[in-house]
Amino acid sequence: MRLPVTLYPGEDGFIVAECPVIPGCISQGRTEEEALANIKEAIELCLEVRKEAGLPLTLPLHEIEVAI
């Protein structure tokens, strides 16, 4: 399964990793590699919990660009 992940700067120099198609699935790391490893683990746990709860594994992602 391939899922989108967003990386962005967090507090204290951490990199935040978030999977936008799984509500609340977020992690962080001191490096991009650590953040990606941590979000992979978080995704596995989130999918397991959603499956056990009978929830859809992922939600649709609708990306749009906004001009400002």
Walk through the language-model features, giving the residues of each.
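Short aromatic-glycine-(Arg/Gly/Cys) micro-motifs in beta-strand/loop hairpins
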Residues: 8-22
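A short, exposed loop/beta-hairpin motif centered on an aromatic-Gly-Thr core
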Residues: 23-32
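Short, charged, surface-exposed hinge/linker loops at domain edges
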Residues: 1-4, 37-68
